[in-house]
Amino acid sequence: MRDPVFTGTAMAYHPFHAHRPTDFPMSAFLAAAQPSFFPALTLPPGALTKPIPDHTLAGAAEAGLHPALSHHHQAAHLRSLKSLEPEEEVEDDPKVTLEAKDLWDQFHKLGTEMVITKSGRRMFPPFKVRINGLDKKAKYILLMDIVAADDCRYKFHNSRWMVAGKADPEMPKRMYIHPDSPATGEQWMAKPVAFHKLKLTNNISDKHGFTILNSMHKYQPRFHIVRANDILKLPYSTFRTYVFPETDFIAVTAYQNDKITQLKIDNNPFAKGFRDTGNGRREKRKQLTLPSLRMYEDQCKVDRDGADSDASSSEPTTGRDAGHSPGPVSSPLRFNRGSRDDKTCTDSEHEMDHQNDRCGGSSSPAPEPSSPFRSRSEDWGREKPIAEKKDDYPDSRKTSDSIFSIRNLEKDKLESRSRKDTDSSKKDTENSGISGSKDSFSPLMVQTESPSHFGAGHLQSLALSGLHSQQFFNPLNTGQPLLFHPGQFAMAPGAFSAMGMGHLLASVSGAGGLENGSLSAQGTGSTPSPFPFHLSQHMLASQGIPMPTFGGLFPYPYTYMAAAAAAASALPASSSTASSLSRNPFLSSSTRPRLRFNPYQLPVSIPQSTNLLTTGLPSGLNPSSESSKCGSREASPVPDHKSGASQRNGSPKTTMKESINELQNIQRLVSGLESQRETSSPRDSPK
C-alpha cells in the first residue's frame, strides 16, 4: 500500500516540487494552516514525501513528532484515497475572475507597489476573486501565496522601475489559507472571496503567519483551489492554481512612485485622512477647527505678551466659551471645543499652557463677563476636579502685564473667576447693601478657613515690604501685595504630623470640603506659638527659596498646595462651631480673607522698602478704611472686603511691630539663608 500512496503523493506535489522543491514545503502549510496542531514547524520540504515510518533521518526535535503522527498520516493517506475515489466522478470546472480588475489594471500600468512593514501591512487593492463552476455539495479549501516573479532586484530611478541586480535569497514560503476554509462550493460561489486580511511583512522571524517578502523585489500572488474537506489533507490534495498577471507588485518599505501613492489615496477608503477634500469626519473636523485654531493661536499670543486691552481678550473669549454658550453659536467652535473641554480640564499641570483655552470653556457658562451667577456649593464643587487648573476669565486678563509665568497667571485666574461669581450671587441674594468692585479682584490660590490670631496690622506687615512690587508679585495689578492667609499662621504643633493625603485632597478640593467640616478640627484651639516655624516654610517658598515643605516628601506642585491646605487642619469641625469665628470678621465662613498664597518659587531678592501701609495694600486691609460692615456674608476677594478696622484686635502700629519681630525671628530660625537675613534687616522700621 505504500507504493501507491507514495506515488500519489509525489504526483500531487509534482507541479510544485519537481523543478523547485521549496515551493510548497510542509512547513508552509503548517505555519499558515493550524500551527496549534503542529508545534514543530521545521519539517524539511520533502519530509512527508518519503514513506512515513522511515524516521532515520529525522532530527531530535522531530523524533517525538513522527511517532505520534505516523499512524495519523497513514490513516490520512488511506482516507484521502478513499474519499477522492467517489468524488473524482463528480466533475467540476472552476472559473475564477478577478474582482476590481480595472483598478488592478490602473496600478499595473504604473507599476504596483505594496508596502511591507515589520508589524505586517495589508495589500491594497485587496486580492479578491469570484468563483464559479464549483460543486455545490463538495468542500473546498481556498489558499493564496505570493511567489517571486523573477530573480531580479529593482530600484526606482528616473520615475521608473529598473533592474538593480540579482535577487536576494528567497524568504520562506508561506501559504495563506482563507479563514472560511473549508466550505462548500455553494458558499464559496455565493459572494466574492476576499483575502483582505493577508499581511505582508519583512520580518524574517515573524510568528504571526504573515507573508515574508524582500523589499524592492517583484512578486506574483497566486490563488489556489483545493478540493478537500480537511486542512490536514492539503499536502495530499491536488491544487488548482490561478495567476493574474495584473496583480504582480514590487514590495517596498515606502512608496516610490507618487502616482501610485495618489492612486491608493484616491481609492482606499482607509486613506481618506490623506485626501485634500473628503467627506470623512476627519476632513470635516480639520475644516471646522481652522478658525478655532487661529483663535487659539491669537489667544496664546495674548497670554504671552500680557496684553491688557479689551479687544485682545474679548474676541478669543467668545471662541473659547462658545462650546458652553447658551445662545446659538457657529458650529465650528461648538464642534471643536465642546467635545474636549472635560477631557482637557483633567490633564496634568504640565499642560496648562497649551490647554488654557479649552479649560476655560468648562467653567465659564457664557462668553460675557457678566455671566450667570452660580451658588457657592456649585462653584466649589466644580473647583474640586480642577483645583490646580486655570480659568481664562477675560476681566482677569485685562491687566496681566506682569513678568510672572503664564502658568501662575492662569492658576490665579481660576480662583478669581470662581470667587467673583460667588461674590455676585451673594450680593444679589443676601447682602444687597454692600457694593464692591466687580472688575478689580485679586486671585486666590488656596482658600482656607483657619481661625486667625492676627489683626489688621499683622496682615499689613505680612505684606512683606518688598513684595508689594506690582511688577513681580502682583500679576493682576489690583492693588494687593503678596499676602499670607491668616490661617496659615495659626496651626497647632501637630498640624504637620497629621499631614498626609487628606491635606492633598483638601488642597485640591478647595474650600468646599472645608466648609462642610470634612477635615478634622485638630487646630481649633491653637495659639500663634507654632507661627514662626510654619510661616517660615510658606514665606520662604513664596520668596523663591527652594525649601520643600514637609521635609521634601512631595514634589514642588504639592508642597505649596498642601502647605495652605495644612493650615486648614486648624479649621473647626464645622464653620459654625468656633466662637472666634463670630468675634473676628475675618474668620466667619463667608467673609474669610482671600489672601493670595503665591506658590511659584521665583529667585528674586526682596528689595529694601519701607512702604507697608499705603503702597499696594487692599482696602480691606488698610486700617483707614472704615466704610465696611463686619460679619458680612460676602465671599469676595480681598479688595471687595470692607471689614471695619475698628473691630480688629490691637492697634495697627503695635501689631505691626510684633509681627515684624516675628518675621525676623523666622529668618533667624532658618539655617543657611544669610542673604535673607541681610535683606530682612531693614524691616525694623516699616512705618
From Swiss-Prot:
Coiled coil: 654-681
GO term, biological process aspect, one: brain development
Keyword tags: Coiled coil, Developmental protein, DNA-binding, Nucleus, Transcription, Transcription regulation
DNA-binding in keyword set: yes
Quaternary assembly: Binds DNA as a monomer.
PANTHER family: T-BOX PROTEIN-RELATED, T-BOX TRANSCRIPTION FACTOR TBX2
Biological function: Transcription factor which acts as a transcriptional repressor. May also function as a transcriptional activator. Binds to the palindromic T site 5'-TTCACACCTAGGTGTGAA-3' DNA sequence, or a half-site, which are present in the regulatory region of several genes. Involved in the transcriptional regulation of genes required for mesoderm differentiation. Plays a role in the specification of late notochordal precursor cells and formation of the differentiated notochord. Required for cardiac atrioventricular canal formation.
Name of the protein in question: T-box transcription factor TBX2b
Source organism (scientific name): Danio rerio (Zebrafish)
Upper classification of the organism: Eukaryota, Metazoa, Chordata, Craniata, Vertebrata
Gene: tbx2b
